[in-house]
Each structure stands twice: as C-alpha cells, then as structure tokens.
C-alpha cells in the first residue's frame, strides 16, 4: 500500500512538472527571425533526444553536417547554438567579442566553483579581469614557467624512478595514475610552495567535478523548474563533494596564513592573493571563497588538461609504432648526453612537438568550449539571442576535411606542410581556446606535457600490457567537460641504454 501511494505521488509530481513546462512553452513569444537553422524539435525536450547515448561533441558534429556551421539546438528550455567552423568561431571569439565572452552556468560549476567566483567559469566582469591579470602576471608568465624548471626536473626524476622499479619487476604501469600524480605535484609546488596533503583525493574530486560540470544535467536544461532542481539526483552528490573540497582548501588557506615562505623562499600564488586581498587599490574585493575557487581552478585546469594530453599522446604513439619510432629517434639524437632538460631544450624537438599538436587536433582537452551571450549579436549572418548558450565544437573542427587532409589519420607530418599553431590565431585549431578567454596557463600546461613526454620517450621503450595489439586499443573518450580517455592506459616500460 505504501509503495502504491509513493508511486502515485511521484506520478503526480512528474505530471505536474511536465504540465507547467508545456504551458510555459506555449506562452513563449513568437521566435525571432533569422535564427540559426536546426533539426525539428520535439515538444518539451527540444533536441535532447539527439544527445541520448552519445558524447555531446559527436552528436553535435552530426547536427552541423546537416544544418551548417552555425546550428540551433534546443536543450530543454535552453536556446543553444553550436559553432563548427573557423569563420563562425572567429566571429564569436574575436570580432563580436566580448558579446560572447561569458560562460554559461551549470549546477556543477555553481556548486563546485564557489558560485562561479573563479576564473574559468566566472562571467566576463571586472572580477574576472582582475583575477586573470593576477594569474598571468604572478604565476603563468613565460619567465615564471621557466623558473619552475627545477620542479619539473625533480618530479620527472621521481616518475622515472617509479618506472624503472616497475620495469625491473616486469610489471605493467598504470600511466594514467602516474601522469596524474606527476602533474599534480608540479602544480602544487609551483603554485602553493609544496605538495599539499590530500592532493590525490583533490585530484579525484576535480575529475568527478569536471565530469558533472558540462551543463548537460537535466536540471541545467530546465533551469526554471524548481522541482527538477530539487529532484536533481547529482545535486546532493555535488554538495557532498563540495564539502570535502572545502575542507581540503580551507586547510590550504589556513596553512598559508601561518607559514613564512614557500619553496622559493618568497611568495607563492596564494601569498600573492592574500597580499592583494589587503590592497585598498583593487577594484573588486578578493574573498576567501574566491581564493578557494582559484585553487580549485589551478587543479582542474592544470592537472586534468596536461595529463589528458600526455596520455592521449602516449596512446596514439602506441597505436602508431612508426610515429613512436620516429619521435624516439629524434629525442634520443637531440638530447643524448644532456641532463636536466627543460623548456628550452625541447624547443628543437620539432617532430615531437608536431606529435603533440596532432594529438590535440584529434583529442582536444576541452572538446566543447562553453560560452554564453552577454547581449544579442550576429554570427555568420544569424541572430544569436541574449543569454543563448554557445558551444564551440573544437573536436569537430579538428576532424573537418575542409581544414585537414586525412582528418581521421594520426599524421604529425601534416604540420610540416601547413603552418598552424594553437595560440588562438588559427580558429580551426584552438585546443586552448581563443580571444580574451584563451587559456592563461597555455605556456605552463604545454611545458608540463612536452618536458615529461621527452623524458618518457628518451629513457624507455614501451609495449602494451598483456600482449595487446595496437589495433585492439580502446580509444574511447569519457563523458564530461574534458576529453579524457575512458580507460586507464596500462603500458610496460623497458629502460633504454644509450650506449647500446
């Protein structure tokens, strides 16, 4: 009897919610003319059915093939636009910028990033400009990236030691875990002065948060429904994660209030934020929550994107042995006899750098760059309404035959023939974004990919675990904001002897 009553209540609640949403849609004003084209919509859900069972970047690429590079998709209540060409992307990110410079808000980002009081997900504002300026000038300048060289060398040396131990025991290595630990340790020491307690747990929390922050939760699609927001099954999980994250970040903040200096004998980035917090000249007060959000940004942007790219590089090299052989030959010839390599040393590794570029073309760290319209604007002749969600399909543009010869083939040599970079000037190739919201940690992140990668290629030969063939490798992506591999990468290292 109790079960029947509970079922009846659930049915009534769902029916009531659906009725309200239908009434709201009926009352909507007549659509504006000259909106982007899109597929036929279903009542209430719009185009949500097109995403079911698929990764969003794949599903939206199919929409663009049929309806063009500026396409409208209705995600529940949310008017959304997918941009899939370099021309449309350039307009949105450069020509009409800052009209499209906001981030759209999701339940995941709002909870985990302290009401979006950070840099990554903050709306375009005085606060965002102030925090970004501090970030770039105090932590992520090219000069500072080079000054962190000894940290990279120390942490890579630690990684090589673990790999040699595993090789001596004949064991396969979970490279996913090892690379995550490496990037986390580098970022902790560079940004916070030392490797923090609970850093491994924080990395896992970041990974979970990013998987739930893409804006594709049901409550994100129907923001006006208080009931759906209340019933959102991931919301309670997010709040549990937020409480644990807050405890870890609060400990970091309190520890910095007590300590005298970081690893360099001077200020680290948190010390800088504390100093700026007391500065009467700053335009927007820096709250403790903003500092915590910044720390969480540093972990989410730094650890996840660098490790994701490094792992995809290694996966593609294992899948393409001839590319692996060519990259190793270059690294071993150029760096033979050298010790303590860092950023300047890897600049001469042209082929390895092309391998990294090719990896980011096929596996961008952020497959769909999220933006939001701050005001009505025009892109490619179409009207984009105020508050529209914009999704720039970086994954799709990286595989578009209009821009790339043999787009589904891993072919680093293509960059010998065509001059393209990822600094935000070639809009068909923007793994770090473009415009005023281009990733401020581009140089730092790239150094944390290229320097460890050169060491992995120089010091070890690699084979797949359990006798697997390259053609058997699973190259699937996981769901979420970042384009991480779905499965961990297990490899068997064999130390390389330069004298042999």
UniProtKB/Swiss-Prot annotation:
Report the gene name.
Answer: CYP71D13
| Parts of the chain that traverse the membrane | 3-23
Q: Pfam families recorded for this chain?
A: p450 (PF00067)
Which GO terms of the cellular component aspect does the record hold?
A: endoplasmic reticulum membrane
Cystine bridges: which residues?
none
Name of the top EC class for this enzyme = oxidoreductase
Reactions catalysed according to its record: (4S)-limonene + reduced [NADPH--hemoprotein reductase] + O2 = (1S,6R)-isopiperitenol + oxidized [NADPH--hemoprotein reductase] + H2O + H(+)
Question: Which residues bind heme per the record?
Answer: 439
Query: What Enzyme Commission number(s) does the record list for this chain?
Result: 1.14.14.99
The record's CDD domains line, in alphabetical order, gives:
CYP71-like
Question: What GO molecular-function term can you cite, just one?
Answer: heme binding
This protein's record includes keyword Membrane: yes
What the record says about family reads: Belongs to the cytochrome P450 family.
Q: Which cofactor does it need?
A: heme
Going by the UniProt record, its keywords in alphabetical order are: Endoplasmic reticulum, Heme, Iron, Membrane, Metal-binding, Monooxygenase, Oxidoreductase, Signal-anchor, Transmembrane, Transmembrane helix
Official protein name in the record:
Cytochrome P450 71D13
Where can this protein be found? Endoplasmic reticulum membrane
**Main localisation:** endoplasmic reticulum
Q: Please give the function described in this protein's UniProt entry.
A: Hydroxylates (-)-(4S)-limonene to (-)-trans-isopiperitenol, a precursor of (-)-menthol, responsible for the cooling sensation of peppermint.
